[in-house]
Structures are given as C-alpha cells and as structure tokens.
C-alpha cells in the first residue's frame, strides 16, 4: 500500500469479506452442512467432468523409472482417460519392446483396484487396461518410420485420433517417439492435407527430451503440432529433471529413498511392491502427464501458466553450446525450425510455516531456475501420490482425501488501475480436517511483471489494489488450500485478473 488511506480501505474490504464468509459458514452449519465424510456419488460430483485423454509411449525396461511412473499413473486412472499404452524402443533399448512389463504392473494394480474404488469412483478394471497395451515397432528411431513400418501401436494412435471426441489427445512420450512419427507419416500418406491438419490439431505431445532421432523429424515435418520438450539428449538441461533433483537449501525428503520405502513401496499392497528402487533418477517420465491431473492449478492447454508438470514458454530454442559427446544416448540437439513449448524460468521463493503468529508466509531464500517451475510443487504432488497409494490398502476412514475448494467470485475478472480488489474462497474437507489457506501471486504466469502487495495471504480472502498499468495486463493469483491430514493434501484455485489503464 502506498498510503494509510489505501490500507484502511483494504482493511474495510477484508472485514466485509470476513463477515460474508462467516455468514456463509454459519448458514451452511445451520442447514446441517458440515465438513464430514462424503458419499461416493458426492465425491464423483466434485471431480472435473472433463478428463484428459492420454496415450503413453514407454521404453519400459530400459530403466526402472518407467515402471515407477506406470505405478503412479494407474493411481490416477480414474481422473485421466488412458486410451493406450504402447511399448516402444529408445536410444537405450533399440531392438525390442517389453509389453510384458506393462502387463505385470497392471496385474499388480488389478489386485488393489477394488480398494481404490472405496475412495473414489471410476478406476478401470485391470482387464480394460490390459486391452489398451500395444506394441510399437522393434526398431530404433527413424529406422522404424516409413513405408512398411506400421505397427500395432502406430495404428492404434491413428484409430484413437480419429475417434469422434472433441477433447485433445495427449501423447506422453517416455522413450523414443518413432511410433508417433510412424502414425503421422501414415496419416500424411493416406489423408488429404486438410484432414491431416484437422487430426494433428487434436494432438498434444510432451516428450521427455529426445530419446531417438524421430522427435526432431516430427517437429520439422508437422510445424503446427503442439509439442512440449527440451530438445536433444542433454538431460541436465531439461525441465523434467525437477521431479528428482536434489536442491540445496530446501527439504528434499519426499524424493528420498527412505520416504519412497515408507510411503510407496512397503506396506502398500501389490502396487506398492511393484514400485522398483531408483537406479538413476526417480520417475523422470512422470512430468509428461503430471499436468493432466485435475487439481485446480493445472491447465494443460496453457503450459505457460505453470502447474505440477512445470511451466513452459513458446519459442524457438537456440542450440546450446555443448559437447555433443555429453548428450546421453548419443541423441544430439538439432536446430529447431519453429517454436515449441520449452524451458521457462521461475523466480521462486518457497513459503515457510510460522512457528508463531501467521501460519504461512513468504520465505527469504529465492531460486531462479527452469527446473524450479516443477520442483516448487513437488511436496504437494508427492504427498498426493502417497495418499493415493494409501488408498490401495486402507479403508476410507483410515486414509486422507483432498480438500474441495470453491471461489466466491469468477476465476477471471477485470479491474481498472487503482481499484480495490477482494477475492475470497471457501473450502471443505471430506475427512473433516483443518485447512490452511495460502494466496500468492504467480508473476511469470501473467504479463504484469511487478509484485502486487496483498493483505494477509494465509486468510480465506485477500484484498489488494489494482496496480497502475499503461496497457491491459494480466496477473495470476493462486490459492493453495492444504489440509492437516497425513499426508497433507493440497488443492488450488487460480484467479486471473486483467488490469486496464
């Protein structure tokens, strides 16, 4: 605030917000509405109606992390429409594919599926998932692309794209991309240009770097294809490494081997036991689909907004100055011919818990890094993973479930410079847990580069003044609501403010 008058006005606004929230809560309790355990039907109603469609391409068996990512993915199979799982090659595994390893994980899932249904509806049967497993060509990279290289996997991608379904189809590439390349090759060889463009416009691709030479071919030959990647085989330059990076200066407990053993692997039934020990890095492939989880934060159609899978900007990346011999697997970075969604940088200051007074407040140590766009959410998505793994063996009463958050105003609003703004939300918890609110500005997600001062960020409502701007600017505010269950679970709401002069 620039003066005491502004501060008084904002405090009045906050008082009004508090009275409104108190009245709403009292009315709810008067009607018998309390934060209690909910029925499966009510739990289904709170899920996003719109599920994202997904096909996974995996070189499972080349590294234990594919199996780890598969274990996690199946725990979210009720909120993501898995439409195919294709066994592929990669630079690490060039001449054979391993669908039997996918089948083994799904068999383990089948042993716990009935218990998962006690917590949320919609988990598919193991038999339904087994039917989605397909084989890609047992060839490396572009050797498997062209006439005579159709495979069960490439034909399945085409069949799935052609479904009468308006939702985008996400292709999550954990290894080589040549099965997708072959599908695109066949589409171009058998369809009109207009039809190819229509079908390609339905695709959304996220590849974990380039693990064969087909990724650059795809990007060059299909310049309008929505594509997220850090090009080449220089894994150290990739955003996805934020999932398992040990970051000096923060608590890295939730990616430790001890944490995985306690919360994922041991005492969590057949699926937990199927989660292998880390060999190189934990779950390097998971970021390619993590942003599809409906949590109130992620919008996959806007990679520049940021979310559990990281944040990305659309531009044509330069070829970095590096020794090609250092590229893992021998997949070099080629010059990009068009913009792709790739590394973006966040200047992130982790919040800290207050021992006294304000429960949560801004910390003092900041990090400016592209990997921070992902690891900043890591404790939240790791705790979410642990809770879902608990669901495989525990009753509903024994486990924790995420809070439900609702805004008290639209998620997109417009104000003029100098106007006073108030936002509020209310949340309930299906287990009756106490909740902590935390509001913060996400500067990199919007166009306004300045910091906006707000009232106490750990209240259910905040107040602020729209900053002075010379042209329309957008500002993103995030509300994170975390319960005090074990493990603590978080859900979010995003408010996008357009400020006009």
Model-identified regions with their sequence ranges:
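Extracellular and select intracellular beta-sandwich modules with Ser/Thr-enriched
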Residues: 488-495
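N-terminal acidic, glycine/proline-rich low-complexity segments
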Residues: 34-448, 472
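Surface-exposed, flexible coil segments in extracellular/virion-facing regions
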Residues: 441-465
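N-terminal export leaders
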Residues: 7-11
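Short, solvent-exposed loop/turn segments at the edges of extracellular beta-sandwich modules
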Residues: 482-488
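Bacterial N-terminal signal peptides
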Residues: 14-26
């Amino acid at each position: 605030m620039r003066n005491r008058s502004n501060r008084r006005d904002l405090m009045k606004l906050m008082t009004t917000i508090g009275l409104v929230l108190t009245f709403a809560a009292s009315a709810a309790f008067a009607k018998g509405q309390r934060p209690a355990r909910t029925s499966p039907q009510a739990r289904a109603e709170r899920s996003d109606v719109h599920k994202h469609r997904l096909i996974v391409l995996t070189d499972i068996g080349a590294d234990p992390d594919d199996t780890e990512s598969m274990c996690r993915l199946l725990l979210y199979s009720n909120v993501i429409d898995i439409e195919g799982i294709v066994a592929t090659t990669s630079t690490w595994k060039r001449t054979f594919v391993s669908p039997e390893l996918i089948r083994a994980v799904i068999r383990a899932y089948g042993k716990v599926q009935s218990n998962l249904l006690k917590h949320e509806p919609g988990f598919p049967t193991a038999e339904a998932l087994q039917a989605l497993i397909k084989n890609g060509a047992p060839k490396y990279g572009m050797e498997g692309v062209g006439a005579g290289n159709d495979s069960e996997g490439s034909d399945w991608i085409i069949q799935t794209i052609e479904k009468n379904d308006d939702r985008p189809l996400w292709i999550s590439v954990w290894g080589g991309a040549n099965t997708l390349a072959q599908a695109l090759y066949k589409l171009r060889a058998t369809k009109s240009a207009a039809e190819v463009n229509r079908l390609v416009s339905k695709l959304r691709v996220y590849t974990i770097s380039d693990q064969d030479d087909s990724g650059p071919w795809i990007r060059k030959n299909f310049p309008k294809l929505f594509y997220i990647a850090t090009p080449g085989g220089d894994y150290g330059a990739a955003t996805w490494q934020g999932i398992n990076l040990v970051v000096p200066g923060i608590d890295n407990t939730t990616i430790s081997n001890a944490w995985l053993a306690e919360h994922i692997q041991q005492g969590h039934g057949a699926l937990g036991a199927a989660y292998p020990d880390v060999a190189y890095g934990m779950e390097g492939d998971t970021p390619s689909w993590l942003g599809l989880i409906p949590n109130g934060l992620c919008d996959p159609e806007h990679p520049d907004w940021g979310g559990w899978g990281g944040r990305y900007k659309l531009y044509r990346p330069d070829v970095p100055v590096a020794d090609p011999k250092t590229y893992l697997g021998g997949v070099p970075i080629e010059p990009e011919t068009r913009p792709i969604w790739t590394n973006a940088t966040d200047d992130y200051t982790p919040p800290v818990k207050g021992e006294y007074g304000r429960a949560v407040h801004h910390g003092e140590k900041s990090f400016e890094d592209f990997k921070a766009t992902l690891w900043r959410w890591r404790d939240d998505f790791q705790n979410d993973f642990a809770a879902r793994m608990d669901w495989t063996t525990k009753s509903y009463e024994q486990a924790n479930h995420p809070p439900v958050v609702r805004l008290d105003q639209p998620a997109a609003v417009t104000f003029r410079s100098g106007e006073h703004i108030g936002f509020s939300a209310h949340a309930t918890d299906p287990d009756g847990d106490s909740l902590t609110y935390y509001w913060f500005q996400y500067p990199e997600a919007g166009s306004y580069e300045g910091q906006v001062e707000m009232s106490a960020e750990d209240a259910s409502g905040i107040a602020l003044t729209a900053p002075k701007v010379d042209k329309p600017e957008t500002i993103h505010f995030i509300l994170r609501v975390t319960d005090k269950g074990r493990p603590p679970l978080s859900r979010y709401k995003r408010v996008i403010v357009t400020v006009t002069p």
